Amino acid sequence: MKSKKKGKKASESLTIMNELVLPNDTNVFGNLMGGRLMYWMDIAAGIAAGKHCSTPSMTASVDNLSFKNPIKLGNVVHIEAKVCRAFNTSMEIHIKVWGKDLLHEYEYESNEAYFTFVALDPNGKPRSVPALIPETDEEKKLFDGALRRRQLRLILAGKMKPNDATELKALFV
């Protein structure tokens, strides 16, 4: 088992998935259904989490899921997921989604979200995860913002008092 002190690079968790949007994946307007996309995003996030912690994990929350542009029937869904911060037993995974129109040869940003996964031991109990080592400027930016996003999640879940959210308070002082 890897030591939490050493950590793993964010890039080691990068997961890329591609799916073709078929008729069964679409609504009456020919757009990819949001639930199907969320299913694929959850799979990508789970794989990224597994690459980071080398153990099964489960979805704990989904935050800031935005739908910017619909993905049409026949287009390819391109999903990239990467762990952006590791806490004690949980990991925040950033996911970006693009649509690729192969016929007209262009791609467009479609969705973005943050998933939180909790690592599990063989008995299904939370277990510690390795620290995360951000390397690129983007990875460092996501890493720095993850603590604020986590504090907001904990406040909204009633697990943290707003006065204890030091990172969030610093934004307003």
Residue ranges of predicted features:
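Aromatic side chains
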Residues: 29, 39, 67, 114-117, ...
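HotDog/MaoC-like acyl-thioester-processing domains
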Residues: 2-17, 72-73, 84-173
